[in-house]
Amino acid sequence: MAVDVDEIYKSTWEHYQKAKSNVIKKDFVLEHRADAISDIIPGFEADKLEFGSYDKENFAVLFVDMRDSTLRAQNVGAEKTFLTMHVYLTALLEVIKFYHGKVIDIMGDGIMAFWGGRAAREEENMVKAIAVKKAGLCGRDMLAVREKVINEIIDKEDLGAPINIGIGVTFDSVIVTKIGIPNSYDVKAFGDCINVASKYSSKVSLDNFVIVSI
């Protein structure tokens, strides 16, 4: 079953209107942030890990990012970039939520999400084939939502040129570790499959995505 585009449009529009009302209330200064959305990778809680911990787990990894976002931001300015991101990220996160993905990182205009892992296998029987399928369907529906939600709102609100995105999906083992210092730390995942998904998200042709199942 595919996502309900109308519901995602409604949710994205409501979120956008809240952001827009804040622009009206006060001057806006754009700050570039690349913080993790949480300190938890499925099955690995930060407060239960030691600094320098080393654990391996298998995940389907999805990377999605916006094409030519730096140039676009320069062309439309800080305020419209702010509003665009509230449309763009909200819509894509709704798709990930629909397919029960776990958002691991939001890096500027890029999103990394995981499916699978030990916890998902035990609780949801999400074996490799199911994890890859969910990640792949998520990527497919992101393309539809980009066209029917994101770009429709951008055009309607005169927020600049249409958005193009790239998506890559892989499956393999990743290393999970707790990194940082007390009171300032994060749980991070590293692995070739993450690098490959990121690479394909930046190189795949428009209106397509690449799935590499290892």
Language-model regions, residue ranges each:
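Catalytic NTP-binding/metal-coordinating core of nucleotidyl cyclase/transferase enzymes
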Residues: 47-134
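Regulatory cytosolic signal-relay segments
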Residues: 1-56
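Catalytic/regulatory signature loops of cyclic-dinucleotide turnover enzymes
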Residues: 170-172, 192-214
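Acidic, glycine-rich loop-and-strand cores that form catalytic or ligand-binding grooves
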Residues: 137-144
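Charged, alpha-helix-enriched surfaces in structured cytosolic catalytic cores
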Residues: 87, 137, 164, 188-195
